[in-house]
């Protein structure tokens, strides 16, 4: 990992992979540490063993599950994107034509914020909304994942009460994925 600054070399702004130059994390001004972007990481228990990673949809469902548990809210806004999300259900079982076995998932609703509503206006009107702590590039990726998961649903299930619906797969355990 290599850390770089984008402005005046005064502080670390981003952490990059030395081999492929992928951005692995960014400086978090609140903690003064580096917040790793987990969808871009692969894990290995041994130095020479093969690495294992999960797709972005799994990482974001874990991220949302952690955020709902630690912050005690289910509605979130993106700091840099004009969208809000609502974690509607954290424990949903479903099956499909591709897999007849039930899979565990999380139902997430998302929509564009109403014109003129910035993050602070939304939070002032509703104390049960929190801001997601993602880098701008991860916010974009997260929103793309929500759109992709929405497109997988039958048309009749793609929206609910003015919100778009996404069903994100959930990891069962550290050793397997059933989604």
Predicted regions and their residues:
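N-terminal pre-domain and mature-chain start segments
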Residues: 1-179
